């Protein structure tokens, strides 16, 4: 009995010892896991505290001043604001009497404004106090999407002095006021001045700037209705002493008229500003007549094919192509000049003499009149519809409609295209899905049967709940550590940059998406030489549905311009919310980088050569003409390529997708593969090229453009802080003049002037028709040439094959020419043929027009039909 009791006691002691030992190991293991979990929490808190130092600085203040509160109590922070409602600011009440300030503001041209543009604002800050003042000027505006932006500038005014300055402030579509404040260095508001803007709401206006010694002669240009009053003109007199030296200063204008004025009075910077404004979409009209040397002489070397002659008196008929109530009412005797504009298209003529010639310059137009524009003032005042006819013929309906739509939709089209372009990121930031799935599977196995069976084996089931907690903390730490390489710790950027290079300047246009991973205020510093334009969408609810802009309205984005940097600050912005901006910088081409060469193009044959002067290799290089391209591929630094060694390919107009995919090589990849970096690079380049073609290469131009992609990653070029996290792509471009003449014979596209639609449905932007009914077009071959031959060039088959899934097909069917002798349409066989002048003679009108009918022989559907490109060769008259 005693022996059995001792054996039982011994076994119980041994079991207790074993359980105690197991428990000890379990407790020690639990302690280790718990310590690891606590360490993970500490690591997370430390990393969060150390991350995004700019957010902490933004919360503490920027440039030594406190950020305004973003809550509804902002009114308390602006107590006793001195209201300024007149033309000048009222003196503020300063308790110490150190600086007594007043503010005067004027804007635009004659205090007129237009949304969706940079608005020139002239500010005069008067200091009638006894001590100098140094502080900040803030301008608060509301963008077209209802977002409040604030622009801030450093200002200084000595005792008894007046500080004058001009600022260019982006004005959103629908914006009708700007709230100005002046604050001291400590952040206290000293002057508050709301300015209500004079913005036309009823009829969209086309702003015309007049640069003339006698602007009164051009008064007839004001108040004219264009294209059935789709637009209404408004003129403004410009002063050479106040003429801007940057193209941003001309952004408010749609048209610039130079007449009876010596352009050489302007500086080189002012002349360059005009040309870059034209390249960006402006329309320049030059009057000539007796003062042709003054107006055109400055531009003659770069605009004309040959020198112009001396002015002489000529009898012209302005009513030749314009219906007048009285026959002969358009006959005028004026001094005219025969001008040969490079790549020019005759808009108005009289008995074959060009009266108004225009040439496309990138996105803009340069037009030259053969006479002094003041000489037709009396005629235009009597026949007001002639201005409608002239501007509609010059601008085209597409440009007129775009100007009109800007009033209503603002930059929405640009916003959506930019969003598609840069709403991406670095693929290296994507997590490894399979690794996360494996860790999750291990966690579930350990958390369920694994942990339970382990504890049961040691008779420690009572610790299961604690084990679950500890195991969860451990795996949370593992997941967190796995995500360190994919986590954003501060503000990050995705961008797409277009670098346009000429022999004189390098222009960087960068579209950037700024995002921050925290719900806290943040800031980023840009290089000071960049201008900043927000890109926003239109407010879907229409004008007036957003909250009224007041002094108490907090801003979401602030742009602070100083000599050291341009700072973008954000507050009240949810984490990872995109803010889109267009950054621009123009600098002298000191190192003479870029592309140069010659391009010869005549009767379908390409020649010449191009050289890469960038100090690095470029990739996916291509020379693009209107409707044609030559693929050059990779080019080393300093390499020269002969264009005759490469195939000239005709692509479908307006179909940027197949063209970009062909140039960048995206089409060579199969299915989408985000793990393939080469595919992603091709896709990003393709997206940028599509954007460029859709927004910058939208119309006819006589020049060629060489495009390529940089092999260098200059991702922080626009940033002050070069350590910031960026990701993007850069495209390089240069314009090249095309020699399309031989022995005074010219070769050009007939589509340089939009055909007249006689019947049917035609889209001039893409040169296509609808197959539901026949299409009849009247082509204008140009009155400045004697036609020698005509060729209809078809799109390369490979583009049509690549475009099988789109809504565009090649035209197949019958083509008829109208015979002026018989009055009937004759069936023509044009496949691969060039028609000479003898074959064309029955079909050409005295004004060199050709009427063509297209009859589709396929099954009528909803697809557009790509028409062949008519190319004409002729000798200059």
Predicted regions and their residues:
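Alpha-helical transmembrane signal-anchor/signal-peptide segments
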Residues: 52-53, 465, 483-504
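Aromatic-Pro/Gly-enriched surface loop or interdomain linker
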Residues: 115-117, 173-255, 259-262, 409
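Short, hydrophobic beta-strand segments
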Residues: 153-155, 165-174, 645-647, 839-842
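Short alpha-beta junction capping motif
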Residues: 250-297, 360-369
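A glycine-centered loop/beta-turn motif at secondary-structure junctions
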Residues: 283, 338-449, 850
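An acidic, glycine-rich "communication" segment
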Residues: 286-367
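Accessory, solvent-exposed terminal regions and/or long lumenal/extracellular loops of proteins
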Residues: 518-820, 860
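Noncatalytic modules at the cell exterior or secretory-pathway interfaces
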Residues: 837-861
């Amino acid at each position: 009995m005693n022996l059995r009791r001792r054996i039982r006691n011994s076994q119980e002691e041994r079991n207790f010892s074993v359980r105690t030992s197991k428990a000890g190991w379990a407790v020690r293991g639990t302690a280790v896991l718990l310590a690891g979990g606590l360490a993970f929490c500490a690591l997370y808190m430390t990393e969060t505290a150390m991350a995004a130092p700019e957010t902490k600085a933004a919360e503490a203040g920027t440039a030594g001043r406190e950020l305004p509160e973003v809550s509804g109590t902002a009114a308390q922070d602006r107590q006793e604001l001195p209201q300024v409602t007149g033309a000048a600011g009222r003196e503020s009440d300063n308790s110490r009497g150190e600086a007594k300030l007043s503010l005067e503001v004027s804007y635009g041209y004659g205090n007129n404004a237009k949304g969706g543009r940079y608005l020139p604002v002239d500010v005069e800050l008067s200091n009638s106090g006894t001590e100098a003042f140094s502080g900040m000027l803030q301008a608060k505006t509301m963008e077209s999407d209802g977002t409040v932006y604030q622009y801030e500038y450093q200002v200084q005014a000595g005792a008894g002095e007046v500080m004058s300055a001009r600022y260019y402030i982006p004005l959103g579509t629908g914006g009708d006021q700007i709230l100005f404040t002046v604050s001291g260095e400590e952040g206290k508001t000293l002057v508050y001045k709301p300015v209500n803007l004079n913005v036309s709401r009823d009829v969209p206006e086309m702003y015309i700037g007049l640069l003339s010694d006698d602007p009164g002669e051009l008064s007839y240009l004001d108040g004219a209705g264009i294209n059935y009053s789709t637009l209404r003109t408004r003129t403004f007199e410009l002063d050479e002493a106040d003429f801007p030296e940057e193209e941003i200063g001309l952004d408010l204008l749609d048209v610039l008229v130079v007449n009876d004025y010596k352009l050489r009075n302007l500086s080189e910077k002012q002349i360059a500003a005009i040309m870059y404004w034209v390249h960006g979409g402006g329309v320049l009209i030059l009057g000539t007549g007796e003062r042709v040397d003054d107006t055109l002489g400055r531009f003659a070397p770069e605009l004309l094919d040959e020198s112009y002659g001396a002015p002489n008196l000529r009898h012209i008929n302005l009513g030749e192509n314009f219906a007048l109530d009285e026959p002969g009412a358009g006959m005028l005797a004026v001094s005219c000049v025969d001008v040969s504009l490079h790549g020019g298209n005759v808009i108005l003529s009289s008995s074959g003499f060009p009266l108004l010639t225009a040439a496309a310059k990138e996105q803009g137009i340069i037009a030259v009149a053969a006479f002094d524009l003041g000489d037709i003032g009396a005629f235009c005042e009597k026949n007001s519809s002639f201005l409608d006819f002239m501007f509609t013929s010059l601008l085209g309906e597409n440009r007129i409609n775009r100007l009109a739509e800007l009033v209503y939709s603002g930059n929405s089209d640009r916003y959506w295209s930019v969003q598609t372009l840069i709403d991406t990121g670095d693929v290296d930031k994507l997590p490894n899905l399979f690794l996360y799935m494996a860790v999750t599977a291990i966690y579930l196995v350990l958390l369920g049967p694994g942990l339970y069976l382990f504890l049961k084996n040691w008779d420690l089931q009572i610790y299961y709940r604690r084990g679950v907690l500890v195991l969860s903390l451990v795996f949370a730490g593992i997941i967190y550590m796995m995500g360190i390489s994919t986590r954003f710790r501060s503000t990050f950027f995705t961008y797409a940059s277009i670098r346009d290079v000429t022999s004189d300047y390098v222009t960087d246009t960068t579209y950037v998406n700024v995002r921050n991973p925290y719900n806290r205020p943040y800031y980023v510093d840009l290089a000071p030489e960049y201008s900043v334009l927000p890109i926003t969408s239109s407010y879907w609810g229409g004008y007036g549905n957003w909250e009224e802009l007041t002094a108490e309205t907090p801003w979401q984005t602030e742009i602070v311009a100083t000599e050291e940097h341009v700072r973008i600050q954000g507050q009240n912005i949810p984490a990872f919310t995109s803010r889109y901006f267009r950054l621009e910088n123009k600098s002298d081409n000191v190192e003479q980088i870029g592309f140069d060469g010659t391009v010869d193009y005549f009767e379908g044959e390409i020649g010449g050569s191009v050289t890469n002067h960038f100090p690095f290799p470029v990739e996916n290089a291509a020379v693009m003409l209107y409707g044609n391209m030559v693929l050059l591929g990779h080019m080393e630094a300093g390499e020269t390529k002969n264009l005759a060694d490469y195939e000239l390919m005709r692509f479908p107009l307006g179909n940027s997708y197949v063209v970009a995919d062909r140039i960048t090589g995206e089409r060579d990849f199969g299915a989408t593969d985000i793990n393939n970096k080469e595919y992603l690079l091709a896709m990003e380049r393709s997206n940028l090229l599509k954007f460029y073609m859709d927004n910058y290469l939208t119309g006819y131009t006589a020049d060629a453009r060489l495009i390529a992609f940089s092999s260098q990653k200059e991702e922080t070029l626009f940033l002050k802080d070069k350590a910031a996290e960026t990701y993007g792509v850069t495209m390089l471009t240069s314009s090249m003049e095309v020699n399309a003449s031989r022995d005074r014979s010219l070769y050009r596209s007939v589509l340089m002037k939009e055909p007249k639609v006689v019947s049917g449905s035609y889209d001039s932007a893409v040169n296509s028709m609808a197959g539901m009914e026949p299409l009849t077009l009247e082509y204008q071959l140009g009155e400045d040439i004697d036609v020698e031959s005509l060729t209809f060039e078809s799109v390369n088959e490979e583009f049509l094959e690549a475009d099988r899934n789109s809504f565009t097909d090649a035209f197949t069917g019958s083509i008829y020419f109208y015979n002026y002798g018989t009055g009937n349409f004759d069936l023509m066989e044009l496949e691969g043929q060039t028609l000479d002048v003898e074959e064309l003679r029955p079909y050409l009108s005295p004004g060199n027009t050709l009427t063509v009918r297209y009859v589709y022989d396929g099954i009528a559907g909803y697809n557009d039909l790509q028409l062949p490109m008519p190319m004409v060769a002729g000798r200059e008259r």
